Amino acid sequence: MKLLTLNTHSLTEPDYEAKREIFVNFMAAEQPEVFALQEVNQTAAAPLLGEIPAGYTPCPGNGVPLKADNHAAAVAKMLADRGVHYHWSWLPAKMGYDKYDEGMAVFSRAPITAAENLLLSKSDDYSYWKTRRALGVCAGDVWYYAVHMGWWKDEEEPFAAQWEKLSRAAGAKSTAFLLGDFNSEADVRREGYDLILGSGWQDTYRLAQ
């Protein structure tokens, strides 16, 4: 089974369109069963997306419509144009750089049968840059969560509190994978990475070595 996760910095990256093309070509060649993306942006002031690519599953509680430059929608369409079809979902968590709807996306080769909108931070203010959410999707009786966590030493929105919410919700599922940007270095002891492993979760990267 192939899983992939990437923080895309979409729309903000230099040479964004060229890098997006490279990424889509790579994904079309590798075709992982599931991949999760973070910082999946769209311009808040952009016009509505005219035609939503096939396979889209709206996430409950998401009141933000897809816009014309939505990164996840672009990836879904570009993959479909290459004959590679994914089921996908997108969830914005906050306003980024005062102009982007910034969120996460999950793409699955198997049909998505359910989606979950999970608030991780104490803040539920869409305009606040520290607001954090997780997007969960169920495909083939397995749950996959795309996450973009806060920092360990953030006194206002600490990683540990967000992790407790995520671990409790995902851990209640029979089988779950967590994919994303945890903002935690694996070689730093007694912080986020050690907390995750100490909570009973396993690092699939290490298991695959």
Model segments located where?
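Active-site regions of metal-assisted phosphoester/phosphodiester hydrolases
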Residues: 1-34, 58, 80-81, 85-209
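Short, flexible/disordered intra-domain loops and linkers
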Residues: 13-15, 44-68
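Substrate-binding cleft of extracellular glycoside hydrolase catalytic domains
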Residues: 62-74, 95-96
